[in-house]
Design a protein with these regions (language model features):
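A short, N-terminal "cap"/entry segment at the start of jelly-roll beta-barrel domains
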Residues: 1-18, 26-30, 106-109, 131
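Solvent-exposed, amphipathic alpha-helical segments
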Residues: 45, 117-128, 176-184, 228, ...
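Short, Lys/Arg-enriched, Trp-marked, Pro/Gly-tolerant hinge/linker segments that flank
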Residues: 108-116, 129-144, 148-187, 191-198, ...
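Terminal helix-turn-helix DNA-binding modules in bacterial transcription factors
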Residues: 179, 183, 187-193, 200, ...
């Protein structure tokens, strides 16, 4: 079976930065940071989580809590003994427009017992957090990045994402078409060919794609192409080369599609992102 996550991580980087390894006692607030979410591991102790939801979240067993996008949240624990945490900032390249960050709900909480596939990397991560070996910080950071891939695998395997790209990648038929789009965005993709990738008729494929992913295949492909174009612009590549790589005939065609998607020309977007010299 084709690797459903390979193109996502190949094109759009994710970086973790560990910032907490130990107890948090009483009330601890985390303000949103532009372009970064957080991945928290609660090893032991009870936690009340306040993050703007109608009801507060109670964690009473070892759990992971992922915020893929910036969101203010507050932990309330026993003021004397607290709860044991290991936490990392998670920076998705492109921020909230990163395909994975955009595809996930505002927060995900999973008991560690519900993600048995993560047991080995969690054991390594917790052991490293308790030790003082040289290279501890980069080791923890890389282990958090590996853990994030495991979490995505588990979310897809358990069907916990109900709509959007990850739901499409979890679908037994649609995932073949999505992987094909991700792997060859420069190609023209007639509806008939995508339907064949999914083993469906044109009508059934189009309706299923829209219901599960939330857009038409054409709109999805354009969004994926523009995301790749933005990555190329962040890397300082020439627009004409980007256009060829993502399936547009030239700079003018890419600029039109870019403006239709973002409301800005590529030059305006680079300036707004602080990428102009």
């Amino acid at each position: 079976m084709a690797d459903r996550l390979a193109a996502l991580f190949a094109h759009f980087a994710v970086r973790a930065e560990t910032f907490q390894t130990g107890p948090l006692c009483g009330v601890n607030s985390l303000e949103p940071q532009a372009g970064r979410g957080q991945l928290h591991l609660v090893r032991d102790g009870g936690v009340e989580v306040h993050h703007g939801a109608p009801e507060l979240l109670r964690i009473d067993e070892p759990s992971l809590l992922l915020y893929p996008r910036p969101l203010a949240h507050r932990f309330v624990t026993d003021p004397s003994c607290g709860a044991q945490f290991v936490c990392a900032h998670v920076a998705f390249e492109g921020g909230a427009s990163h395909p994975i960050a955009a595809a996930l709900p505002p927060w995900v909480c999973l008991p560690l017992a519900a993600v048995p596939g993560c047991a080995r990397v969690l054991g390594q991560l917790f052991a490293e957090a308790e030790a003082s070996h040289c290279g501890r910080q980069p080791m923890l950071d890389r282990l958090f990045e590996v853990l994030l891939i495991w979490v995505l695998r588990e979310l897809m395997a358990q069907g916990r994402v109900q709509s959007g790209m990850l739901a499409g990648l979890s679908h037994p038929r649609l995932r073949g078409a999505l992987v094909a789009l991700h792997d060859a965005p420069q190609r023209e993709w007639p509806l008939e060919e995508l339907a064949a990738q999914a083993g469906m008729s044109r009508t059934v494929f189009a309706n299923t794609f829209r219901d599960v992913v939330g857009s038409t295949p054409g709109v999805y492909l354009q969004r994926w192409r523009i995301g790749l174009a933005q990555k190329g612009l962040r890397e300082g590549r020439a627009l004409k080369h980007i256009a060829a790589d993502v399936g547009y005939g030239g700079e003018a065609a890419l600029s039109r599609a870019f403006r239709a998607h973002t409301g800005q020309s590529p030059r305006e977007w680079r300036k707004a992102e602080g990428l102009m010299n």
